[in-house]
Regions:
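Structured secondary-structure scaffolds
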Residues: 24-64, 71, 80, 84-89, ...
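Cys/His-rich short segments
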Residues: 163-222, 226
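Long, amphipathic alpha-helical stalk/connector segments used for oligomerization, subunit docking
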Residues: 403-414, 419-423, 437, 441-463, ...
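A charged helix-plus-loop insertion that forms the helical arch/lid used to bind
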Residues: 108-121
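Basic, alpha-helical terminal appendages of large translation-related enzymes
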Residues: 2-28, 68, 74-87, 93, ...
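A glycine-rich helix N-cap at a beta->alpha junction
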Residues: 125-139
C-alpha cells in the first residue's frame, strides 16, 4: 500500500457520511505541527517537532527528482536550480502556532503579575523565534487568541450543536490542569507515594470535579474510529503501528466527554456561542486551529481565505505521544460529527530526554534550543556570530535521534561528538580532500558517465558495492523516510554511503596517481557521491548542504554563462573556497 495514496474512504454510520479522505488535483501537501502551550518557554522537544515537520515538507518536494540519480549526462548543468525550490508554497503548506487558552496560562500569567493576553503576547513570539532560528519555514503561524481562530471555533461549535452530538449534563470525573485533560477512573493511580491521585499516562496530578457542562457524544463514534484507525492512518512500520494499537485501546474504553467548563472555573478561553457562562474546552479550541489556517469556515467564495479550502484535509499531522488521545480519538470524532474529511496520516514521536528524564517545567531540566545552538560551538566561540550552516547543527542532532521509535537522550557531549564525527570528519574532510590545491590543482570536476565508471572500476568488489549503493541510495532513503517514517534511519543510510566514499578514495589514493585522468575520475566519483548525499540531507541541514554544493560548483541560482561553459568542456568549475565546511567543535 502506498504511504500517501489518496483513496476516498467512506463509511456510513448513524446516518452520517464520514469522509476519511478527500482528493483535489491542485491540493498542496498540507502538514501540521501541534500548537504549543505558552505556559513555559520553548524547549528541545518543541524544536524537534517543528524541525521534523519542516524537514518532511522539504523532502516532500525533493523526493523522486531526477537529480537524485548519479552520473547523469547533464549533471553539471542548470537543471539543479529547481530542486532548491522545496519551499514553494504551491507545493506544500506547513502550519505551526501557539495554544494560548486554559487554566495553565492563567496561572502562569498570575505568577508573572500580568493579565493572560499580555502574557500570551510575550510568550508566543518566542516560538516564532525558535522556528526562525532553526530554519523552519512555516506557511502560517496561528495563535488561538486571534480573531480568525475565535470565529472558526464558534462556527465549528455551531456545526457540532446542529449535528445533534452535543447535550448538557452533569459531569463528574477526574481532571488534570497540567494536561488540560479529562480522565476515566481506570486511567488514574490513587496509590502512588505522594498520596495525590495522578494520571497513569503522564504522572500529573488530577482532581475530582463535578460540573454542569456540555458533553460530546464521543462514545457513538467508536465503530467509525476503529475503522479509521484500521485504514492506515498511522504508517505501517512497527514503530508507528503501535500507536494505532494504543488508540484502538483508548477507543474501546471511551465515554462521552465534556467539551466545556463553567466560566466561573475557567474564564480565560473562548465562550460557548449563545452561552457566556460556559467556556469551550481548551482541547476542542486547540484542535480547530488546523481548520483555522485553511480559512475555515470557507463561507465566502470571493474571500481570498476561501481558496485555502483546497488544503483540507491534512496530509500529515505530527504529534507527540502524550497527545495521541486528542489527535487519534477526539479530533477525528469531532470531524466525523460535522462531516469533514479526516487527516490522511498521523505521525507520532517519542520524547527528548535529558539524562534519561523527560523535560518538564517542574523538574527544571528544560534546555532552551536557541541557547543550546550557541553553546554547541563551545566556550571559545561564545562571542561568535552563528552562521546559517552552523545553525543547522542542532537541527541535525535532533533529527538523528530515534524519536520515531523510542525516547532519545540528548546531551551536549553526545551532540558535539556526533557533529565532529559525521559532519566535520566524514563529510567535511572528504570535501576538503577533493577540492584541495594538492589533489585538485585544476579546481574543477570532470563529468564522467556510468559506462566510464564501470569500465575503470569493475575489478574490485568493494568498488562495485560502493557504486551499487550510490545507485540505490535515493530509493533506500525514500523507503526509510517516506514509507517507514524513520528519517533517522534514512540519514544513517546517507552516512553509510559517505563512509563507503571515504573508503573508496583511500583505496585508490588519487594523491599518488600519476595519470591525471585516473585521478580526476576518482575525484569525479567522490564529488558525485557528495552531491547526492548533500541533496538528500538538504531537508535535514538545508544551509550546510547548500554550502557544500556551492563549493562543488553547484548553485541554486541561475548561472547560465558558467553552466554553458561547464557543458561545453564537460567539467564543473569548483565554487569559491570559503574555508572548511564546518569547524570542529
Amino acid at each position: 500500500m502506498c504511504f500517501f495514496s489518496q483513496p476516498l474512504l467512506r463509511t456510513v454510520a448513524s446516518n452520517h457520511l464520514r469522509c476519511f479522505a478527500s482528493t483535489h488535483a491542485e491540493k498542496p501537501f498540507f502538514l501540521t505541527c501541534p500548537i504549543f502551550y505558552v505556559n513555559a518557554k520553548p524547549h528541545l522537544g518543541h524544536a524537534y517537532t517543528t524541525c521534523l515537520a519542516d524537514a518532511w515538507a522539504r523532502y516532500t518536494c525533493l523526493r523522486n527528482q531526477s537529480v537524485l540519480k548519479p552520473f547523469q549526462e547533464d549533471y553539471v548543468a542548470s537543471t539543479y536550480s529547481f530542486v532548491f525550490d522545496y519551499c514553494d508554497h504551491s507545493k506544500t503548506f506547513l502550519s505551526c502556532g501557539t495554544d494560548e487558552h486554559g487554566s495553565k496560562v492563567c496561572r502562569a500569567a498570575s505568577v508573572n503579575n500580568i493579565d493572560p493576553q499580555q502574557y500570551c503576547d510575550q510568550m508566543s513570539p518566542l516560538f516564532q523565534t525558535l522556528c526562525h532560528a532553526t530554519h523552519v519555514k512555516y506557511n502560517d503561524f496561528i495563535r488561538t487568541t486571534e480573531t480568525r481562530h475565535v470565529k472558526a471555533v464558534h462556527e465549528f461549535w455551531k456545526r457540532l450543536n446542529a449535528s445533534g452530538n452535543l447535550y448538557r449534563s452533569k459531569y463528574s470525573g477526574w481532571y488534570s490542569i497540567s494536561d488540560e485533560a479529562f480522565y476515566m477512573p481506570w486511567e488514574i493511580d490513587e496509590t502512588n507515594l505522594s498520596g495525590v491521585p495522578v494520571s497513569k499516562e503522564t504522572g500529573n496530578p488530577v482532581e475530582w470535579i463535578e460540573e454542569d457542562n456540555y458533553m460530546f457524544k464521543l462514545s457513538s463514534f467508536k465503530n467509525d474510529l476503529h475503522k479509521w484507525l484500521d485504514s492506515g492512518v498511522f504508517p505501517k512500520s512497527s514503530s508507528q503501528s503501535v500507536w494505532a494499537d494504543i488508540a484502538h485501546n483508548i477507543v474501546d474504553n471511551v465515554q462521552d466527554v465534556s467539551i466545556s467548563r463553567p466560566k466561573s472555573r475557567l474564564d480565560w478561553g473562548i465562550k460557548v456561542p449563545d452561552d457566556d457562562e460556559q467556556t469551550i474546552y481548551v482541547w476542542l479550541d486547540a484542535l480547530v486551529n488546523y481548520l483555522t489556517v485553511t480559512g475555515f469556515p470557507w463561507s465566502n467564495v470571493n474571500d481570498a481565505n476561501c481558496k485555502k479550502h483546497t488544503l483540507w484535509p491534512p496530509d500529515i499531522q505530527f504529534l507527540g505521544k502524550d497527545i495521541i488521545r486528542f489527535h487519534a480519538v477526539l479530533w477525528p470524532a469531532l470531524l466525523m460529527a460535522v462531516d469533514l474529511p479526516l487527516p490522511r496520516r498521523l505521525i507520532c514521536h517519542h520524547h527528548v530526554l535529558i539524562d534519561n528524564v523527560k523535560m518538564s517545567k517542574s523538574k527544571g531540566n528544560h534546555i532552551d534550543p536557541i541557547v543550546e545552538q550557541s553553546a554547541l560551538l563551545s566556550e571559545e566561540f561564545n562571542n561568535h556570530v552563528i552562521t546559517p550552516a552552523e545553525s543547522d547543527m542542532l537541527r541535525y542532532v535532533l533529527l538523528r535521534l530515534p524519536l520515531l521509535t523510542f525516547d532519545g537522550t540528548y546531551s551536549r557531549e553526545m551532540a558535539r561528538k556526533m557533529i565532529n564525527t559525521e559532519l566535520v570528519n566524514w563529510i567535511g574532510n572528504l570535501l576538503s580532500r577533493i577540492t584541495s590545491e594538492s589533489l585538485n590543482p585544476e579546481h574543477s570536476i570532470i563529468q564522467i558517465t556510468r559506462e566510464q565508471v564501470d569500465h575503470m572500476f569493475h575489478n574490485d568488489n568493494m568498488d562495485i558495492d560502493f557504486l551499487n549503493s550510490l545507485d540505490n541510495i535515493s530509493h533506500h532513503f525514500d523507503q526509510l523516510w517516506w514509507y517507514e517514517a524513520q528519517p533517522h534511519k534514512a540519514i544513517e543510510e546517507v552516512l553509510r554511503v559517505i563512509r563507503q566514499t571515504n573508503a573508496f578514495i583511500d583505496r585508490h589514493s588519487p594523491w599518488t596517481e600519476r595519470e591525471p585522468l585516473r585521478r580526476q575520475s576518482v575525484l569525479s566519483i567522490v564529488s558525485e557521491s557528495l552531491r547526492i548525499c548533500a541533496l538528500l540531507l538538504q531537508p535535514v541541514i538545508p544551509n550546510l548542504s547548500i554550502r557544500l554544493l556551492h563549493r562543488l560548483g553547484i548553485y541554486y541560482e541561475e548561472k547560465e554563462e558558467q553552466n554553458q561553459l561547464n557543458i561545453s568542456h564537460r567539467v564543473r568549475v569548483l565554487g569559491e573556497n570559503t574555508g572548511k565546511l564546518l569547524r570542529k567543535l
